[in-house]
UniProtKB/Swiss-Prot annotation:
One of its GO terms (molecular function) is DNA binding. InterPro entries: YbaB-like_sf, YbaB/EbfC. NCBIfam families: DNA_YbaB_EbfC. One of its GO terms (cellular component) is bacterial nucleoid. It is found in: Cytoplasm, Nucleoid. Homodimer. PANTHER family: NUCLEOID-ASSOCIATED PROTEIN YBAB (PTHR33449:SF1). This is Nucleoid-associated protein XF_1808.
Length: 107
């Protein structure tokens, strides 16, 4: 009986590892847009939080302080969206198994 449980656990662990790998690959391809100032500034991040592009409306180019604030806000917006996507994708990849507190995915 015990041997069957161990084999089943090993199969689940292998399936979870495959699912995590697939989810990480999907996240690497993902692009998320964060925006601020009613769309005057937008930041595009990859699923690994690599900044791919920053767009700034030309109408605000003379206000450096506003641009700085809006870039930070747009980046944070995109970062939060990546976190949400990551949690959803990694959560489904772990087959519903709960992880210990503070255990962060991807590794």
């Amino acid at each position: 009986m015990m041997r069957g449980n161990i084999a089943q656990l090993m199969q689940q662990a292998q399936k979870m590892q495959e699912n995590l790998q697939r989810a990480q690959e999907e996240l690497a391809k993902l692009e998320v847009t964060g925006s601020a100032g009613g769309g005057m500034v937008s930041v595009i991040l990859s699923g690994t939080k690599e900044c791919r592009k920053v767009r700034i409306d030309p109408s605000i180019l003379n206000d450096q302080e506003m641009i700085e604030d809006l870039i930070a806000a747009a980046f944070n917006d995109a970062s939060n969206k990546v976190d949400t996507e990551s949690k959803e994708r990694m959560g489904s990849a772990t087959l519903g198994m709960s992880l210990p507190p503070g255990f962060k995915l991807p590794f």
